[in-house]
């Protein structure tokens, strides 16, 4: 994708767009490194999680909004607004994806517990650890320090996530970024913003 984008921008002689994609490529690499270095880290904070997914995932969405705006000669403020919308949408997308890893449906093709089995600490686990008792915290921590986790371990986590209503908490967390996006979209007329607002809602409600 990046090589094709660079080719098109070279033809269009858009140095600004090329510089941004180069920056995005660097940020994605940083995000991947941060995620790998935080595997099994149950002390990961929600702010650190957001930083990781912003770099690893949301920057791609931001670029998808920003680069076309640059190439079509949009004003600077509109480029900034579109970039922010892309970032917010990317964060929502990843939060929901990580939530569905625990609350998805196998019938829709979602493999349940993949992140847990790989030792990835994502938002559902971060929010769960804020709610559980100290003994429960230590049990969950022990599960993440194991070399291998099994279905019994996953079932324990799933029961605690359900008991503590973590799906609701994750959706509410994602909705914060929906609200941020709607504040930007309200600056535009309904025809321009309506479709994107619908997309925000459907992304939070998606099942797989």
Where are the regions a protein language model picked out?
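Juxtamembrane/membrane-water interface recognition
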Residues: 132, 189-190
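Charge-dense, low-complexity intrinsically disordered segments
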Residues: 47, 51, 76, 164, ...
């Amino acid at each position: 994708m990046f090589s094709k984008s660079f080719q098109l921008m070279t033809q269009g002689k858009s140095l600004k767009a090329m510089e941004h994609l180069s920056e995005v490529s660097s940020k994605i690499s940083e995000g991947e490194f941060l995620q790998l270095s935080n595997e099994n880290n149950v002390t990961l904070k929600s702010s650190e999680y957001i930083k990781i997914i912003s770099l690893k995932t949301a920057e791609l969405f931001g670029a998808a909004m920003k680069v076309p705006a640059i190439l079509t000669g949009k004003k600077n403020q509109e480029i900034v607004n579109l970039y922010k919308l892309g970032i917010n949408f990317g964060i929502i997308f990843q939060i929901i994806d990580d939530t569905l890893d625990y609350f998805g449906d196998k019938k829709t093709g979602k493999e349940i517990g993949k992140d847990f089995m790989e030792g990835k600490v994502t938002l559902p686990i971060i929010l769960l650890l804020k709610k559980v008792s100290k003994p429960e915290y230590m049990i969950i921590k022990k599960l993440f320090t194991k070399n291998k986790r099994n279905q019994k371990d996953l079932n324990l986590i799933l029961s605690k996530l359900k008991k503590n209503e973590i799906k609701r908490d994750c959706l509410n967390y994602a909705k914060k970024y929906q609200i941020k996006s709607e504040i930007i979209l309200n600056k535009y007329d309904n025809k321009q913003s309506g479709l994107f607002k619908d997309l925000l809602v459907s992304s939070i409600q998606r099942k797989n």
